[in-house]
Amino acid sequence: MIDMLKKGLEKTLKFFPRLEDLAEVFDPLHRGEAFASSPNPRSIERKYILNVPTLKAKSSVEKITDGQSYEILGQPTGFEISEVKTAEGEIKIRIDFVNNIFADVMKIMCNVGLVLMMVFAAFYFAGINPADNLNLEVQKWSEPAEKFWSDVKGIHSTGYSWFLQNPLDPENAILLSVTLLALTPVIGILLTIPRSTGALRVIFLVIAVEFVYAIFRVMMGGGPMGH
C-alpha cells in the first residue's frame, strides 16, 4: 500500500516543474547579460561533443572537462548548442539554446495551467464556493448578453476582462487557467529576448508587442461579453 502511494505521489509530482527546470530558464550560461547570475560552473562557454560509433570525425579538437562529465571546446563559435538526451546508440539532436528556453517555458507553463484548470474544475462541479445561481442562469439564458449578465451577476462589462472581477469564483478561476495557457507563448518569447541578439531579438520584440497589444485590445475593448 505504501509503495502504491509513493508511486502515485511520484507520478503527480512529475506534473510540476522541478527546480532544475526553472534554473535552466532563469540562469543564463553567459555572464554580463540579463538574468545572469554570479560566476558559477554554468557560466563557462560550453558545447557538448557528440560521440557516435558509426560516425568518424574528420579532425580532432582539444577537450577539457568542467567536472560534470561534460566535454567543452576551448573556444565555441556561433550559437550555444544544448544537447537532447536519447537512448544509448542513437544520434543525439542538438538544438539552438533559444529554442531550448522556449520549449522549457512551454512545458512548465502548460503543466501548471492544466493542473490549475483541473483543480478549479473539480471545485466548480463539487459546488465549492459557488458564485452563480445556475437556476437563474437557465431562466435568463435567452436574454441578450448585456441584460443576461446584469440580471444574473449584476455587472455591466464589455470585452473579456469580466472574469477578473471575482477570481475566487471557480468558474472565473478556470478561465484564469485558460488565460495562463494562452499566455504561454508570450512568456516564452519574453524570456528568450534577453538571450537572443541582433535581428532575432528585434523579431522577438515585435512579436511580443503584437501579442500584448492584441490581448489588451480584446480584454479592454469590444462589445458586450457573450454567454
Curated annotation (Swiss-Prot):
Its main location: membrane. It is a multi-pass membrane protein. It is found in: Cell membrane. It comes from the Archaea. Keywords: Cell membrane, Membrane, Transmembrane, Transmembrane helix. The chain crosses the membrane at residues 109-128, 173-192, 199-221. GO terms for cellular component: plasma membrane. This is Uncharacterized protein AF_1633.
